[in-house]
Amino acid sequence: MLWTDCLTRLRQELSDNVFAMWIRPLVAEEVEGILRLYAPNPYWTRYIQENHLELISILAEQLSEGRVRQVEILVDSRPGSILSSSEQPATTTAALQTAPIPQPAKGKREPEPVANTAVSSKSSKKKLLNPQFTFSLFVEGRSNQMAAETCRKVLTQLGASQHNPLFLYGPTGLGKTHLMQAVGNALLQAKPNARVMYMTSESFVQDFVSSLQKGKVEEFKKNCRSLDLLLVDDIHLLAGKEASLVEFFYTFNALLDESKQIILTSDRYPKELTELDPRLVSRFSWGLSVGVEPPDIETRIEILLKKAENSGVDLPRNCALFIAQQVVANVRELEGALNKVVAISRFKGAPIDLDVVRESLKDVLAIRARTISVENIQRVVSEYFRIPLKELVGPKRTRIYARPRQLAMGLARELTGDSFPEIGMAFGGRDHSTVMHACEKVVSLREEDPIFDEDYKNLLRLLQS
C-alpha cells in the first residue's frame, strides 16, 4: 500500500517523536490520483500543512511512480472513522521543527463571552494559587525591590503595554513564583470574578497534549485565551517542546491583542534563552523584564524572622543572623534550614538557641567549611581585581587596594560564619572595629555606587557557583 511505503520513508526522515505523535496516527486513502490524509482536528491539519505536506507529496509521487500527483490533508469527519484512542499520540515532547511563529493580529477581535468566574483547574497537573503567596508576606530587600514594586504597579495598570508581558528572571528559589502569584491573589481579592490562571510550563505541555489526544483543542484554546491574567512559571522549560511553544504563542498573541496581562518567569534574562527561537525570545521583551537577585544578609535575616513569626516560632535574632550567614543561595534553602532548626528544637524539647542551630545545620556547616572560607574569598577577589593577594591583605590604603579589601571583608562577613576579630586576623591582623567599618562601608557603597554594587554581585555569584 502506498501510505505504508510512505510511512517507512517518513520514519527514516523524521525524528521518532514527530513521527509517533503527528504522522503515524494519520489515516490515508487514495482516490483518483489523490492521496487523502485524515487528521483528528484542524490544529493537526495545519501543523502537517506547514511542516510535512511538501515532503509527503514528494514521497507519494516518487513511490507511486507518478500515479499520485496530489496530497490533501483533511479533518476526519467521515462517519465511523474517528481515530481510536490507541492511535492517538502518546508522547508529550514532540518536536514541531519548523512551524512558523504566529504573528499578533493587527486588529482587535471581539472577545468571546465567558463565565464570570475565576479560572481554576480540575486537573491535578495545573496548580492553583497559593494563598500564602501575597504581597504582605513577601519580604522586600535590595535584591527584589524593583520586582516587587513592578508587580504592584501591574495591578493598577493591568494589561498596559509598557509591562505586558512582565518577565521576571533570576535563579531558582528567589521568590519569583511568590511575586507572580501575589499579583493573581491581589487581583482576585479586588475582583473576585476575574479570570486568573497559574500554570507551570510542564502543566501547559501536559494539558495541551492531552487536549490533542482527546480532540479538545478548541476547549483548551478557549480556556487559555479568555483570561484576564495568565501566569506561567519557568517558561524556559518549554524549550524542545516546539508544538506546545507554537500553541503557547497563539495564546500569547491572542491575550496581548486583547490587552490581557501575562506574567512569565525564567531562570535567565530573555536574550539568554538561546535554546528558543529568537523570534519567540523577542516577544518576551515586548513589555518589561525585571531581575531578582539572591537576597543580601539583611534580607535573609528578615525573611527568617518573618517566616518564624508567621509560624508562631520564637527565633532569636542572633540565631537568624547565624542561619543567614550559613545559607546564602536562595530563599527556598533558607526556609528549609529554618524548618530543620524548628524540627530539631521540638524534638529536643528545647528553645531555639545557637547550640540547636549549629546542631541542625551541621551538614551545611561542614559543606561550607570545605567550599567558602575567608582565604577563598581573598583569592577570588584578588583575581577579580587583578591585584596581588599580598596587597589585598597588606597595609596599603590606596584606593586601588582599599576598595577591594573592604569588599572582601564584607563578603567574608556575609558568606562565612567568622566573627569580626577572625576576619580581621585573616586580613593582616586588623582589629574588629576596622572590619565592622569596612562592612558598613560596603553597605553604603552598594547603595551609592552602581559599579561597586555590580562588582559585589559578580563576586557573590562567583563564590556561590
Curated annotation (Swiss-Prot):
Q: Give the region (Domain II) as residue ranges.
A: 88-127
Region annotation Domain IV, binds dsDNA: residue ranges? Answer: 346-465
Region of interest (Disordered), residue spans: 81-123
Q: What is the annotated localization of this protein?
A: Cytoplasm
Entry superkingdom: Bacteria
Positions with biased composition (Low complexity)? 88-100
PANTHER family with a match to the protein in the record: CHROMOSOMAL REPLICATION INITIATOR PROTEIN DNAA
Function in brief: Plays an essential role in the initiation and regulation of chromosomal replication. ATP-DnaA binds to the origin of replication (oriC) to initiate formation of the DNA replication initiation complex once per cell cycle. Binds the DnaA box (a 9 base pair repeat at the origin) and separates the double-stranded (ds)DNA. Forms a right-handed helical filament on oriC DNA; dsDNA binds to the exterior of the filament while single-stranded (ss)DNA is stabiized in the filament's interior.
HAMAP family named in the record: DnaA_bact (MF_00377)
Query: What's this protein's name?
Result: Chromosomal replication initiator protein DnaA
Q: Which species is listed as the source?
A: Acinetobacter baumannii (strain SDF)
